[in-house]
Amino acid sequence: MGKFLKKHYIMAPGPTPVPNDILTEGAKETIHHRTPQFVSIMEETLESAKYIFQTKHNVYAFASTGTGAMEAAVANLVSPGDKVIVVVAGKFGERWRELCQAYGADIVEIALEWGDAVTPEQIEEALNKNPDAKVVFTTYSETSTGTVIDLEGIARVTKEKDVVLVTDAVSALGAEPLKMDEWGVDLVVTGSQKGLMLPPGLALISLNDKAWGLVEKSRSPRYYFDLRAYRKSYPDNPYTPAVNMIYMLRKALQMIKEEGIENVWERHRILGDATRAAVKALGLELLSKRPGNVVTAVKVPEGIDGKQIPKIMRDKYGVTIAGGQAKLKGKIFRIAHLGYMSPFDTITAISALELTLKELGYEFELGVGVKAAEAVFAKEFIGE
């Protein structure tokens, strides 16, 4: 694209764009983590984080990606030989399974096609067949397929039973409605580089009293991820925290609070609706049977090299999207509408997609995708 100045747009489901106001916080002087000044910042930040989890329970921070928080959940809840139910409908459901295997759990797997969403009825059936199961591991937003589950409905099933409900909300938090306490979700994990609009490197976890009951009984080895140490030192950190990431998280939480969490959820819904309208107008098919507000997974049309779509969009037009993972590599592409993204970012991504598909020989009327996305925005913003 030598004729034009190429700007860069991250439209992948993590890392996502980081606002300049948050980047500026990260550039501030690093202060010592054991000073009263920093402990005060840490307390303010972790208390503010309760708002996005919609919980009264403490939120704890690790210097890790979301996978670290996932491992913390398994290590603190599961003892070797414990029976657990794991929903596997994508790459990150597989990660729950692999973590539970690493800690010696007796796994009951609910295996679904990638793109399907587990139902509350399937969870209830698995629990009825396995009343001795101690934990149910779910993925709220399966980033690899663009699928969101009925977490509220599942929580209605589990909260009346002697089982702990865990969800991976790494990509969902801040994009999908999540009301931890009201719904009865027992443990939630997330990461910084998605809906929280931060660089990678920080993970958050919150759990209720029901989950703490298993934490106290767990016989699994744990050290850095031992939640008992974090509870004991709260709001301080038992180990050296990611100081500048905490600055950035504080600013991100302020921005989310100013916008209002319900407005944040609604913004993500609108961007998701526009993206799906655009790809359908192009004659493309969604992978997910229950798509959500985080990312849209699209099947590569017949006769098109799926690996070329993200490559051309990135290298020629400066728009970074994601391809498929694992067995979906080359078969789908994924356009995010997550975190610090606007309607015009979405329109830019759809325009770059159209130009890329046209170059690859896919037949369609140029502009129909952009027009469909604009129609969604017009309806939402000006009532047309």
Curated annotation (Swiss-Prot):
Keywords assigned by UniProt, alphabetized: Aminotransferase, Pyridoxal phosphate, Transferase
Gene Ontology molecular functions: alanine-glyoxylate transaminase activity; L-serine-pyruvate transaminase activity
Source species, domain of life: Bacteria
Record GO biological process: glycine biosynthetic process, by transamination of glyoxylate
N6-(pyridoxal phosphate)lysine modifications at: K194
InterPro entries for this protein: Aminotrans_V_dom (IPR000192), Aminotrans_V_PyrdxlP_BS (IPR020578), PyrdxlP-dep_Trfase (IPR015424), PyrdxlP-dep_Trfase_major (IPR015421), PyrdxlP-dep_Trfase_small (IPR015422), SP_NH2Trfase/AEP_transaminase (IPR024169)
Essential cofactor(s): pyridoxal 5'-phosphate
Primary role: Involved in the degradation of L-serine via 3-hydroxypyruvate. Catalyzes the transamination between L-serine and pyruvate to yield 3-hydroxypyruvate and alanine.
Family from the record: Belongs to the class-V pyridoxal-phosphate-dependent aminotransferase family.
PANTHER family: ALANINE--GLYOXYLATE AMINOTRANSFERASE, AMINOTRANSFERASE CLASS V
Protein's name in the database: Serine-pyruvate aminotransferase
Lineage of the organism: Bacteria, Thermotogati, Thermotogota, Thermotogae, Thermotogales
